[in-house]
A protein has these predicted regions:
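Winged-helix-like regulatory helical subdomains adjacent to P-loop NTPase cores
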Residues: 147-150, 157-250
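Short hydrophobic "helix-edge" motifs at membrane interfaces and signal-peptide entry regions
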Residues: 14, 151-153
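The catalytic "switch" region of P-loop NTPases
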Residues: 4-11, 15-20, 25-144, 190-195, ...
């Protein structure tokens, strides 16, 4: 093992490259259990102490943003354990670029003639990515409130700006295609977009509640009680009144 490690490090140094190891986060952090909390404290100390700026091998432990403040409190020395921490946050543009690359592969497989007719496109560039989406989606869509909205904005609005959410929605929209290349189903109909989102949005909402369950265990029930009582727009005062009347009963 030692020889292998030295060989890898020497190779990375020779090519002036760094190797990053990402330890993915758990799905369920049971931090209210003392043994789990103590284990997490030790893990944070270990990861925080072993990485140095000049190391060619960088080990990164991924933590969900929703639990960041809770985990900071577990750390025995946050200044040391988190001195090289990075917050990863996706933007709408980045999601569009990721989605466009997937979309291009889809078109190459099932609608190559249609894709060829669009001319050369680079889905890693913002302009071409938007052009690709503009070719397969209607420019606007009528939302459930009866207002016109840009289609790509409408789809993104149903995500937490996470790639997996955006890809889940796109997969759902394009999955029920049922057509052939000769039928040319583009732009996708408004009904298919609305139906595709409807089939996935509940799973996304459930995922969000699960992510916050450790910190806000009653959030889902409070939302079920309060949201039906609120309009599309409401003041802080209205929210407070509805919460006092309906939400507090959960506790």
């Amino acid at each position: 093992f030692d020889n292998t490690t030295l060989s890898v490090v020497d190779s990375l140094k020779a090519t002036d490259k760094n190797f990053v190891i990402l330890m993915d986060s758990l799905d369920d952090f049971q931090l209210d259990i003392e043994s789990v909390s103590n284990s997490m404290m030790g893990l944070l100390k270990f990861v925080g102490s072993m990485n140095k700026p000049r190391d060619v091998v960088d080990i990164r432990f991924c933590l969900p943003t929703e639990l960041y403040r809770r985990i900071i409190k577990i750390s025995s020395n946050p200044n040391k354990d988190f001195r090289r921490s990075l917050k990863l946050q996706w933007t709408a543009t980045e999601l569009i670029l990721i989605g466009a690359q997937r979309l291009k592969i889809y078109l190459e497989l099932y609608y190559p003639d249609f894709l060829h007719g669009l001319g050369p496109l680079d889905p890693t560039g913002r302009s071409d990515a938007l052009k690709l989406f503009g070719a397969v989606l209607p420019k606007t869509i009528t939302n459930h409130a009866g207002f016109q909205e840009e289609t790509i904005s409408y789809i993104l609005r149903h995500t937490q700006l996470l790639p997996r959410h955006f890809l889940m929605l796109l997969n759902s929209i394009f999955r029920s295609n049922g057509g052939t290349q000769s039928l040319n189903p583009f732009p996708v109909s408004e009904a298919r977009i609305l139906n595709g989102i409807r089939q996935v949005e509940e799973r996304i909402v459930t995922e969000i509640f699960v992510a916050f369950k450790l910190i806000y265990p009653t959030a889902e029930e409070v939302c079920k009680r309060c949201i039906p009582e609120l309009g599309h727009k409401f003041s802080v005062g209205e929210l407070h009144r509805v919460y006092t009347r309906r939400g507090k009963a959960v506790f």
